[in-house]
UniProtKB/Swiss-Prot annotation:
Gene3D superfamilies: Cytochrome Bc1 Complex, Chain C. The gene is MT-CYB. SUPFAM superfamilies: a domain/subunit of cytochrome bc1 complex (Ubiquinol-cytochrome c reductase), Transmembrane di-heme cytochromes. Heme 1 (or BL or b562) is low-potential and absorbs at about 562 nm, and heme 2 (or BH or b566) is high-potential and absorbs at about 566 nm. This is Cytochrome b. Its main location: mitochondrion. The keyword Nucleus does not apply.
Length: 379
């Protein structure tokens, strides 16, 4: 008799994805972040659901309802901070996951990569709308500034912004719709993640060498299930350290002031995980140019498979490309720092140089390095 996990219509899917899945024997800890993202998503949906039970999406009561959650609801404070800091962990895992894909050439799986890019955009949209919900100063002004960017679109821009706002400014209608979208999008993300996994399992996982591992596969369970559990425990440990010891470390103090349309905060900035894109936006003096650069800073990932010139898939044996990759990482960290600084010298110039460098690295230097490395192989 066949094992139920191999014959049952539902269990068969789980079995083929998480138990009997043939996996490369040499995938490193950089491959842990996919499962960690799944854990982050489940955690965000669960904590978010409990927060939604007590939250009110009305401009007059939103801020008070968040205070009420933290003060009066049983364990409301920990649920709120798990959700807020869980978003930070989510983005750390996301950026590492994308970085891993870049380094080891996982972008050669085109469908998986492109759905990943759609996922990244969707998660960013969800996080942005979630930041608006507590209705603090930075929530309100962040929503105003970022939605206003759409007014840079010629001809239809202003109409589009007012349509998104549901009025002539960010107000009750905006908050209500943002809450609705923030609630529904994680489920769309979960569905997309399922498709992401479906396409990945069509080809099988990549591995650090970038060479086919078909001749050396091991079952996912127990080898990688135990490895993923260890990763999950470390993730939860870091998250709990953050939540229990320094819950406001990554937040903005301005968001503890209720939203006031008549008082603009001195420095409007998004959450830390958007600062690199915000720095690129600010480093271009033209509004439409800035918006295009902002979108392109993420959308450039879609062009990476087209820009791959090397005969090798992975960067494991390509020292020049490795050097450029880590320069890109350092550059994005520099942009993250600049995004949190006021718009004044020397930060303006640093931001502009770092922005130009980030695009140059991806569009020019890395493809050229690939060609050079191909020639070095012939020597």
């Amino acid at each position: 008799m066949t094992n139920i996990r191999k014959s049952h219509p539902l269990l068969k899917i789980v079995n083929n994805a998480f138990i009997d899945l043939p996996a490369p024997s040499n995938i490193s800890s950089w491959w842990n972040f996919g499962s960690l993202l799944g854990i982050c998503l489940i955690m965000q949906i669960m904590t978010g659901l409990f927060l939604a039970m007590h939250y009110t999406s009305d401009t007059t009561t939103a801020f008070s309802s968040v205070a009420h959650i933290c003060r009066d609801v049983n364990y409301g404070w920990i649920i709120r901070y798990l959700h807020a800091n869980g978003a930070s962990m989510f983005f750390i895992c996301l950026y590492i996951h994308v970085g891993r894909g870049l380094y080891y050439g996982s972008y050669a799986f085109l469908e998986t990569w492109n759905i990943g890019i759609i996922l990244l955009f969707t998660v960013m949209a969800t996080a942005f709308m979630g930041y608006v919900l507590p209705w603090g100063q930075m929530s309100f002004w962040g929503a105003t500034v970022i939605t206003n960017l759409l007014s840079a679109i010629p001809y239809v821009g202003t109409t589009l912004v007012e349509w998104i706002w549901g009025g002539f400014s960010v107000d009750k209608a905006t908050l209500t719709r943002f809450f609705a979208f923030h609630f529904i999008l994680p489920f769309i993300i979960a569905a997309l993640a399922g498709v992401h996994l479906l396409f990945l399992h069509e080809t099988g996982s990549n591995n650090p060498t970038g060479i086919s591992s078909d001749m050396d596969k091991i079952p996912f369970h127990p080898y990688y299930t135990i490895k993923d559990i260890l990763g999950a425990l470390l993730l939860i440990l870091i998250l709990l350290l953050l939540v229990l010891f320094s819950p406001d470390l990554l937040g903005d103090p301005d968001n503890y002031t209720p939203a006031n349309p008549l008082n603009t905060p001195p420095h409007i900035k998004p959450e830390w995980y958007f600062l690199f894109a915000y720095a690129i936006l600010r480093s271009i003096p033209n509004k439409l140019g800035g918006v295009l650069a902002l979108i392109l800073s993420i959308l450039i990932l879609a062009f990476i498979p087209l820009l791959h010139t090397s005969k090798q898939r992975s960067m494991m044996f390509r020292p020049i490309s490795q050097c450029l990759f880590w320069t890109l990482v350092a550059d994005l960290l520099t942009l993250t720092w600049i995004g949190g600084q006021p718009v004044e010298p020397p930060f303006i110039m640093i931001g502009q140089v770092a922005s130009i460098l980030s695009f140059s690295l991806i569009l020019i230097l890395m493809p050229v390095a690939g060609i050079i490395e191909n020639h070095i192989l012939k020597w």
